Structure formats: C-alpha cells, structure tokens
C-alpha cells in the first residue's frame, strides 16, 4: 500500500498499525539519533509484560500527578482518540501539536519506513523534550 494515497487518519488507524508491524529497534534508534536523542537524559520507567501495562501506567500517572511532578506518559492503544497515547501531567497532547509533529517526522524520515507506532513514539519523545518533563512512563508496544 502506498502511503501517499492514505489520509492522515488512515495512517494512524489501528488497522493500519496492526498490518504493518516490523519488529526491531534499529529504525527507531537511527531516527532518534538524527533528532539529537530527545529525552535521552530523562529518567524513564518502562512498563513491559503481557498483561496490566495500561493499569500500571495509570497507577504511576496518578501517583506522579498527586506528587506534582512534571512527567510524560505513552500508552497504546488508544480508546477514542490517538492523542490519548501521549500525555503530559495527565493532559493529552492537543491534535494540532500531534499532527504537526507526526507529519514532520513522517516527511523527514520517510526513507526509514517507520511503523505508525514508531512514529508515535518519536512524536511523544519530541513532545516530552519540548515540555521539559522530569520523568517518563513508557508502555511497551509489544509485551
């Protein structure tokens, strides 16, 4: 399928994401290096495993919010809106910021053929870097 013929919504839809899984971190590492490794120096909690990742992320998010920390969270999949996947201090990224960052990453790094999930992670890390968060909660895309 040619990406040029897809709408923005189709590019980020769950069906498109499921059908375009490419395992490995090499593409993502290269893109993040070219972006100056956003968030590289920010401590992160990575949540992995088969079940309960979303629940653990929600618990941690509530604890950090009550502690008045400045933090970023990525989760997947979203329930209603793609912007749910990227949050700072319990607030979703707004659609304008998300689309601007997503389209920029898609155009600038088209040759890497990033998956939609990888593009969203790049968006999140760039957004968190811009917001100068002090801690990250990152839910793994696959167990």
Features from the language model and the residues they span:
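Short active-site-proximal "capping" loops at secondary-structure junctions
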Residues: 51-53, 78-79
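Sequence-level detector for tyrosine residue identity
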Residues: 15-16, 59, 80, 112
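ATP-dependent carboxylate-amine ligase catalytic core
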Residues: 25, 29-40, 65-143
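Conserved phosphate-binding and hydrolysis motifs of nucleotide-dependent enzymes
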Residues: 49-52, 139-141
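Short functional linear segments
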Residues: 1-49, 56, 62-69, 74
């Amino acid at each position: 399928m040619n990406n040029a013929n897809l709408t923005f919504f189709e590019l980020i839809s769950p069906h498109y994401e499921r059908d375009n899984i490419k395992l490995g971190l090499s593409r993502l590492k290269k893109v993040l290096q070219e972006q100056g490794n956003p968030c590289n120096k920010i401590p992160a909690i990575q949540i992995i495993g088969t079940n309960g990742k979303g629940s653990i992320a929600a618990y941690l998010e509530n604890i950090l919010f009550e502690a008045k920390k400045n933090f970023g969270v990525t989760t997947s999949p979203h329930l209603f809106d793609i912007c749910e996947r990227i949050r700072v201090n319990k607030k979703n990224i707004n659609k304008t910021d998300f689309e601007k960052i997503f389209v920029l990453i898609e155009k600038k790094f088209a040759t890497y053929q990033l998956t939609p999930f990888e593009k969203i992670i790049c968006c999140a890390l760039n957004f968190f870097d811009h917001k100068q968060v002090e801690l990250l909660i990152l839910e793994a895309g696959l167990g």
